């Protein structure tokens, strides 16, 4: 049985232990120590990483009563070794996990919803709640969670007897066999949990609910705590200041300024589209009435403009109109249409002679092709 030092002291960063066993595995070596401060994956939290005698530990898993450390190199059995966990990573995870307990406890107490899902990685922490919350209710929960941090109450760990457990009102997502570890944040939450937590709630720092979405009849919340919340604030502050500078707007007026720019952009896009269509009309006007076949090459056409130009030309009585956008270096996008004949044979020829791609219906085909303008024009002569 591996002694779990991460339960004895969640802030223990370095420890010594005896190597019980070390065997080769798929991606290195699998070692069991007499005791460990490395937390194995569990309870929605990833495993600790670090080093043992300078050898990298990339994963930790618990199997039965033993904890297996997965290393990039071999350890000598029977030797006393020194382990060091990646503390910044562990502390960040404890900040998130303890913060999640506070948020879940507050939601359960105020709205009666359960935490039905939890995931914690090195970027985000998400929790799934069994019922919906409005924007105002989320802000209420966030404010209450930070008030809890300010109170800086100690986190209490206990292992109640089965008799005591029956009388205890605690949160738990699953039925637990054997000894149950209870994490209590006085006044805010009582929950069964296997993960290490901070000593005092004040260590969590800022709790910020950054995103929410409807999920399986409830809500999924993305939250950041401590250093992660600080980093997020700093990044957003930089973005806000950049927008303020670009729009020459005060901080409290940037949303209004962005909306104004958005409206102006929409108007300009509309005016540009109208102008571009007028250019297409002028371009089509230059085509003689009733010309049987028209082949147009224009590198400036974009989006749906080739098709629009084709339709304008066909309205002039042209039997077949082919429009190519692009250039010889990067290739051409094309559209070919007719109101009087099947244009699919043209697409077939382009495929065969110019390694083209495309297809469509008898009245219109479109695709891409590589070749010279001169050679492609001969197809329509």
Can you describe what each PLM-predicted range is?
Residues 1-381:
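A glycine- and charged-residue-rich anion-binding loop/surface
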């Amino acid at each position: 049985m591996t002694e779990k030092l991460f339960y004895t002291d969640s802030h223990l960063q370095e420890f010594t232990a005896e190597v019980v066993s070390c065997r080769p595995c798929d991606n290195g070596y699998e070692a069991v120590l007499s005791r460990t401060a490395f937390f194995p994956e569990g309870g929605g939290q990833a495993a600790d990483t670090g080093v043992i005698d300078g050898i990298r530990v990339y994963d930790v898993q618990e199997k039965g009563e033993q904890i297996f450390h997965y290393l990039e190199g071999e350890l000598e059995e029977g030797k006393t070794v020194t382990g060091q966990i990646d503390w910044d990573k562990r502390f960040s995870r404890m900040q998130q996990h303890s913060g999640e307990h506070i948020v879940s406890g507050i939601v359960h107490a105020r709205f009666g919803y359960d935490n039905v899902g939890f995931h914690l990685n090195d970027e985000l922490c998400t929790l799934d709640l069994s019922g919906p919350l409005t924007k105002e209710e989320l802000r209420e929960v966030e404010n209450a969670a930070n008030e809890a941090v300010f109170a800086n109450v100690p986190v209490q760990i206990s292992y109640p007897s089965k008799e005591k457990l029956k009388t205890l009102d605690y949160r738990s997502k699953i039925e637990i066999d054997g000894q149950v570890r209870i994490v209590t944040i006085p006044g805010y939450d009582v929950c069964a949990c296997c993960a290490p937590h901070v000593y005092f709630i004040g260590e969590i720092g800022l709790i910020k609910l950054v995103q929410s979405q409807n999920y399986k009849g409830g809500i999924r919340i993305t939250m950041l705590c401590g250093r992660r919340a600080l980093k997020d604030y700093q990044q957003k502050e930089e973005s806000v200041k950049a927008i303020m500078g670009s729009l020459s707007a005060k901080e409290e007026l940037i949303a209004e300024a962005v909306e104004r720019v958005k409206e102006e952009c929409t108007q300009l896009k509309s005016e540009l589209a109208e102008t571009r269509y007028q250019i297409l009309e002028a371009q089509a006007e230059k085509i003689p009435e009733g010309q049987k076949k028209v082949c147009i090459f224009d590198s400036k056409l974009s989006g749906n403009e080739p098709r629009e130009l084709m339709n304008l030309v066909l309205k002039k009585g042209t039997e077949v109109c082919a429009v190519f956008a692009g250039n010889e270096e990067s290739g051409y996008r094309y559209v070919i249409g007719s109101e009087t004949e099947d244009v699919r044979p043209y697409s077939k020829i382009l495929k065969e002679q110019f390694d083209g791609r495309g297809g469509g219906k008898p009245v219109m085909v479109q695709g891409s092709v590589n070749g010279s303008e001169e050679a492609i024009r001969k197809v329509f002569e």
